[in-house]
Amino acid sequence: MAKAVDKKFCWEIKNFSSLNSERCHSVPVVIGDCKWRLVAFPKGYKADYLSLYLEVADFKSLPSGWRRYVKFRACIVNQLSQELSVQQETQRWFDQNAPGWGFENMLLLTELNAKDGGFLVNGQVMIVAEVEFLEVIGTLDESEEIIKSSDLINKTQEVAQQVKEIIQPNDLINKTQEVAQQVKESIDVNGFQVLPSQVESVRRIFKKHPDIAVGFQVKNQHLRKTFMNFLVNVIETMCQSLQELSNEDLVEVDIALTYLKDAGFKVDWLEKKLDHVKEKKEKEQSGLIILQGIEQQLHELMHKCEKKKSEVLSVGAPLKFDDVV
């Protein structure tokens, strides 16, 4: 296991073309208080792309409730031209339920394995990863402190219960005031308290899909408001341009729609829209790859053109007097 330098580490996958395993992983490196490793699917994961993920290798040894909000940048190095290297970046929460995350469509396998493409040289693929912590919750040191203080917590439980009985009425008053303030700042639309800025959007949703919340049985107004806000945010995410939407964003939208559907919302129409957006995203990515190839060819042709132009000008130059005599 090697220590990462400046939050970056390099993974050289040798004999890439002869790998028979479905997945392979790098040697773990230490960044912060965790061991991280890259996981690759050389034959693709449900697609014709090289899939690449970042994973917490020692997540089972971390304390319960641990979370790491990480900026993850991965680059498939083009060993012939640095400018043609493929890079993707994301920011994600890693936790006990999701210790790994990454890019399902990192690079087309046909482009990766292309002869003289620059990504596969002498049977080797080179990947550079960068991991940056944005927020850390639950460290090993905190876990030890919790264990040491458990006896004190047990001894004070009886007193805490007595205090709780005194505080509860005040908490109830504060909570009631908080809910009342939220309701005051909200507007009712079809039984949902929504922010003034979302009123028009929610009304349009119910106008086009009046049965969207028929199966949603939650009565608590705070939860109803949260779910509706969640739905509006999902739709607003899908309204972003393809350049702003990453493949990971689309995966998150897919998960969010499943969550809403499980809660009782009818979102089949949104699922169809999502499929359409995914198709457009795939076409965009394929088009960009083709465009990149055309631009490279154009660059080479322009270079040849300039060279030939110089030759023609040189040949067409008039003879000097001394050249004739």
Curated annotation (Swiss-Prot):
Gene3D superfamilies: Apoptosis, Tumor Necrosis Factor Receptor Associated Protein 2, Chain A. Residues 6-131 form the MATH domain. SUPFAM superfamilies: TRAF domain-like. Pfam families: MATH_2. Residues 266-315 form a coiled coil. The keyword Coiled coil applies. Keywords: Coiled coil. This is MATH domain and coiled-coil domain-containing protein At3g58340. It comes from Arabidopsis thaliana.
